[in-house]
Amino acid sequence: MGNDGGSLPTRNELVKEPGKVPPLDIDFKRSVKSSQFSQCAITDEPLYPPIVSCGLGKLYNKASILQMLLDRSSVPKSPSHIKSLKDVVQLQVELDDSGKVLWLCPITRHVMSDTYQFAYIVPCGHVFEYSALKQFGEKMCFQCNQVYEEKDVIPINPNAEQLKTLSKRLLDLALSEKTHSLNKASKKSNKNGDKKRKHVSKSNSKHAKHELRTNRMLDGENVKSETSVTDMERVKRVKI
């Protein structure tokens, strides 16, 4: 090889390395992740207090949730799992000097980013770096001493595996008639039952009126019969 006038193949020609991800794709993914903790999940508007989060760890402006609950048609990306304010928890957030939301962990002093995932505690809503809560021994909020269970630590913008766990938590809460905020779920009014009750009430009312009329008629007949008997006795006495 090489003595016949040909050229030897180089290593790069023989070994194919995996293609590198273009820098633009990396920047795009980072910008998407960044928008998830800086923009409202249903309106894409910048997040501003009061900020709330659902059981799936997404962030919303509370004003947007209120608007959605009043008129779902006004919010194209309306999440079906949010049926009332009980299905969200208001987060305890701080503002920086410029008035923007500051996601700062009081334990690690890290700022929430695509590098540091954050989570919040239900029901108090205090926000921490997720890894710090995992390492924290006591199940008591570092800020307010609220006792909590591990399942009520909600990762913000969860990955696929975390999302499965959160979905199961919501299902378990629904079976126990509770909401994401751990408040009791509102019972839906049974329209058919209400109609039946109204129908029965009307029927009972009609029956009562009919019974009253019947009693009055019977009372009238009794009065007439008593009067006729008295008159007959008077006639007999006169004849005698």
Curated annotation (Swiss-Prot):
Residue span of region Disordered: 1-22, 181-240
Keywords, comma-separated and alphabetical: mRNA processing, mRNA splicing, Nucleus
GO biological process: mitotic DNA replication termination; mRNA splicing, via spliceosome
Localization terms from the record: Nucleus
Keyword Transmembrane: no
Feature: compositional bias, Basic and acidic residues: 211-224, 231-240
Knocked-out gene: effects: Increases intron retention in a subset of pre-mRNAs, including rtf1/Replication termination factor 1. Decreases replication fork arrest at the RTS1 replication fork barrier. Sensitive to methane methylsulfonate. No sensitivity to hydroxyurea.
InterPro entries linked to this entry: Rtf2, Rtf2_RING-finger, Znf_RING/FYVE/PHD
Function: Putative splicing factor that is required for the correct splicing of a subset of pre-mRNAs. Required for the correct splicing of rtf1, a replication termination factor that mediates site-specific replication termination at replication barrier RTS1.
Family the UniProt entry places it in: Belongs to the rtf2 family.
PANTHER family noted in UniProt: PROTEIN C20ORF43 HOMOLOG, REPLICATION TERMINATION FACTOR 2
Name by which UniProt lists this protein: Splicing factor rtf2
